């Protein structure tokens, strides 16, 4: 009796299962896309944090480096 009630009720997890995890190619695509998006998000966050913590210490911030002395 409970299983019949569960089947008709649905739910978020059951909808997710039907949409993503029921077929292997869709599941693999979902996992690969999630990994790529997650990697980009982590990379962006770490890069932003690194740049904020190292303002003035980076090569790009030092204006004298890479310039030739002017002969007068």
From Swiss-Prot:
It is a single-pass membrane protein. Residues 1-27 are mitochondrial matrix. It is found in: Mitochondrion inner membrane. InterPro entries: QCR9 (IPR008027), QCR9_sf (IPR036656). SUPFAM superfamilies: Subunit X (non-heme 7 kDa protein) of cytochrome bc1 complex (Ubiquinol-cytochrome c reductase) (SSF81514). Its main location: mitochondrion. One of its GO terms (biological process) is mitochondrial electron transport, ubiquinol to cytochrome c. GO terms for cellular component: mitochondrial inner membrane; respiratory chain complex III. Residues 54-72 are mitochondrial intermembrane. Pfam families: UCR_UQCRX_QCR9. Keywords: Electron transport, Membrane, Mitochondrion, Mitochondrion inner membrane, Respiratory chain, Transmembrane, Transmembrane helix, Transport. The chain crosses the membrane at residues 28-53. The keyword Transmembrane helix applies. Component of the ubiquinol-cytochrome c oxidoreductase (cytochrome b-c1 complex, complex III, CIII), a multisubunit enzyme composed of 3 respiratory subunits cytochrome b, cytochrome c1 and Rieske protein, 2 core protein subunits, and additional low-molecular weight protein subunits. The complex exists as an obligatory dimer and forms supercomplexes (SCs) in the inner mitochondrial membrane with cytochrome c oxidase (complex IV, CIV). Belongs to the UQCR10/QCR9 family. Component of the ubiquinol-cytochrome c oxidoreductase, a multisubunit transmembrane complex that is part of the mitochondrial electron transport chain which drives oxidative phosphorylation. This is Cytochrome b-c1 complex subunit 9. It comes from Solanum tuberosum.
